[in-house]
A protein has these predicted regions:
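Flexible glycine/proline-enriched surface loops and loop-helix/loop-strand junctions
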Residues: 132-135, 234-235
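Flexible, low-complexity linker and terminal segments
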Residues: 3-10, 162-377
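Short amphipathic alpha-helices within nucleic acid-binding modules
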Residues: 147-151
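Short, flexible turn/loop "capping" segments at secondary-structure junctions
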Residues: 128-132, 271-272
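Structural motif
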Residues: 75-77, 101-103, 138-140, 166-168, ...
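Thiamine diphosphate
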Residues: 1-128, 135, 152, 171, ...
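Flexible, glycine/proline-enriched loop segments at strand-loop-helix junctions
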Residues: 134-146, 163
Length: 377
């Protein structure tokens, strides 16, 4: 049945996650993500799932790893301070290849910062927060409807590539209320984990079949031991000191993402085809930027915006294509310039790059963006 529901971004995340098959949530209340825990506590029992409020953020991350390891699609939610506490176990999930979704509704920092104010200060942390080289997928929605649809995508990518996925909201989008059209009867792609089918590899939980990059999941609850560790390990899942095996594992963990960037990444390009000025934005910042583009287009200016929906891995190919015909790129972020570094790395030789940031906990307004455009002309 098709219905249009007024809901908050945080609530839409829960509904999308449940549609994707999420049946376990472990979390600890923290502004501005608390509504995700509250909604999960109500909705999961209705769907045969389980909600647990953990003693802290560290335990929350550990709990969803454990639930996912035995086959239950799992999610947690937090904000900046809690995201910091989760980093060690996020690395564990990367190494053990345990699919899960971590929602980070960003708020102004550092430290406790401004708990109810918007920020995009955790973008680099989503990429580099845990130690060592590790695979990363991070997705950033800009509307309540995207909170619903992209939550499904987060789970699909987590299951397909056996990796934690960060759903990187900001306070603007998390607390935004909009109408969302939901059709429970319309088919939506939901990817479930692939299980081992070859008996000869059942005792090798990390064996990768020829031509594949991701090991199929071991059937748990049977008479075959399934060892999970954060240490470098061989196909049998047991720790190894063999440098060649450890190197091959680390390479595969990275390549299973790098080789499939085209499948993972998605962008939105708005009026970029003939644009002399392209604004790069993401998340809630897009809402002010879209107003700017429409306003200046009405005055005859050639301007558009490029929005990475997948912020990690960054959509390099798509950005280079847009920058090839642009004269100027303006990066607009609620931070001191984090995606700015990626933009400069990728297209600094193709066009002029300017930046507008905000770290005082207020929304970047269309007027501020237009003023910046006029200043750098």
């Amino acid at each position: 049945m098709k219905k249009r529901i007024l809901m908050q971004g945080n609530e839409a995340v829960v509904e999308g996650a449940i549609r994707a098959g999420m049946r376990f949530f472990a979390g600890y209340p923290i502004t501005p993500s608390t509504e995700i825990a509250e909604q999960s506590a109500v909705r999961l029992p209705q769907e045969g799932g389980h909600f647990i409020q953990m003693e802290d953020e560290i335990g929350s991350m550990a709990a969803i790893i454990g639930a996912s390891a035995v086959g239950v699609k799992s999610m947690t939610a937090t904000s900046g301070p809690g995201f910091s506490l989760k980093q060690e176990n996020i690395g564990y999930a990367c190494m053990a290849e345990i699919p899960c979704v971590i929602v980070n509704v960003q708020r102004s920092g550092p430290s406790t910062g401004l708990p109810t104010s918007p920020s995009q200060g955790d973008v680099m942390q989503a990429r580099w927060g845990t130690h060592g080289d590790h695979p990363v997928i991070a997705i950033s929605p800009s509307s309540v409807e995207e909170c619903y649809m992209l939550a499904i995508k987060c789970f699909n990518l987590a299951e397909k590539y056996r990796t934690p996925v960060v759903f990187l909201l900001d306070e603007i989008v998390g607390h935004l209320r909009e109408g969302v059209e939901i059709d429970d009867e319309q088919p939506i792609e939901v990817i479930d984990r692939r299980m081992k089918e070859r008996p000869d590899t059942m005792h090798l939980p990390y064996h990768v079949d020829e031509g594949e990059d991701v090991p199929r999941f071991h059937l748990t609850g049977y008479d075959i031991r399934y060892n999970i560790t954060g240490l470098a390990h061989g196909e049998d899942g047991f720790p190894t000191n063999n440098n060649e095996i450890a190197g091959a594992l680390n390479t595969r963990l990275m390549q299973k993402i790098d080789k499939h960037v085209d499948d993972i990444t998605s962008v939105e390009e708005y009026k970029c085809d003939d644009a002399d000025t392209v604004i790069v934005c993401y998340g809630g910042t897009k809402r002010s930027v879209m107003t700017v583009v429409d306003t200046l287009r009405a005055k005859g200016e050639k301007i558009g915006y490029f929005r990475p929906i997948t912020v990690w891995p960054f959509p390099e190919k798509q950005l280079k294509k847009v920058a090839a015909h642009a004269k100027r790129i303006l990066v607009v972020e609620h931070n001191y310039g984090q995606i700015l570094y990626e933009v400069e790395r990728i297209v600094k030789d193709d066009c002029k790059i300017d930046f507008l940031g905000n770290v005082k906990g207020t929304v970047i307004t269309p007027a501020e963006i237009i003023k910046k455009i006029e200043e750098v002309r």
